[in-house]
């Protein structure tokens, strides 16, 4: 942490001396295996707007397959790649920048770029950077599980959003590219086998929408607004002093911080140029921002929401079905028509890949109890990732996030389950976990009582 503090402080000192956006000369800091390691002192604290970066080094347990074991099954659950802002946010960002340009009477130092900044970001779709992320993800998946991928074609599903489907397709491109370089592979090119519509009334385990009480709950919005009201005023005052003539809200402050990530991800195909928006803010402010995003996800979709984990029950029960090769037992968000048909939900595959959104993935992780060690997050002060027991939006659901659910066969007869989130081994809960973070399959499934019992899903439809 001391190195982080010194490095980040140095970065901000230098960024305030120069008005030029930092640039790396090549994209060796952005690789398929390590993810986005460019400008890590800032890019790794953007919450869910961080691009995927491997956190293998943060794991107390090696991600390598233990000696004497082999992986016999893998399910990857992935978020889509980096995207442009949503349509509503894109309009808000553009309007804010126009207002600053209209009202500010001077632009100096790190703010000079704002005077002539032209907002050209699109809305909702993947950026080229995001497309490349998913190509890298597919290639990494093939190489990591080559022994299985050589002989098995993954069964692939995607939630129906354009950016999610496009992410699945780019993942396939990367998988196929690695496959073609492996002369030992004889399998056909994968395809997106199932696209689950994101429409009202259509059950979809990869996108929440059907739990009425959950969708109408505004508690997380209130918690986010309260924390923004704590961190926002000092930043707002400083920006208003530095840019005379402007008036900002606390929400405006967060929007300007959002632009750091979105502008960076849109500038180049590999993220080699850091947006000048980033240098407007300090180390402390970025840590507050990162925590704000984690807070929002925890109380919006995780254990901090009464019905957050319930949104992940359906997928959890689908994973149980795949691991045990038995019919899906679920009465929550699963689509019975799809899940009862071997053509749309086979149970005999060795490789599965599903593509989703950050919010749904948070719910799934908490439905599985992966972060049961995380205590309720403070609503008024920043906690470290260590204090949150490894939970953070940037560590769990960055753009291009991926969780690997592995089944291993070792010397003993009974298979073992292991879970990695962005390359970090997450020790399992609710079962007898070994030194490698694993539990036997039967023990882990038995420990998933919340999901197997349907949790509190029935309260979704109570007034």
From Swiss-Prot:
Transmembrane segments: none annotated. The keyword rRNA-binding does not apply. It holds the Pfam family His_Phos_2. InterPro entries: Acid_Pase_AS (IPR033379), His_Pase_clade-2 (IPR000560), His_PPase_superfam (IPR029033), Histidine_acid_Pase_euk (IPR016274). SUPFAM superfamilies: Phosphoglycerate mutase-like. PROSITE patterns: HIS_ACID_PHOSPHAT_1, HIS_ACID_PHOSPHAT_2. Residues 1-19 form the signal peptide. It is an enzyme of class 3 (hydrolase). Gene3D superfamilies: Phosphoglycerate mutase-like. One of its GO terms (cellular component) is extracellular region. Its main location: secreted. Belongs to the histidine acid phosphatase family. PANTHER family: 3-PHYTASE B, MULTIPLE INOSITOL POLYPHOSPHATE PHOSPHATASE-RELATED. This is Phytase A. It comes from Emericella nidulans (strain FGSC A4 / ATCC 38163 / CBS 112.46 / NRRL 194 / M139).
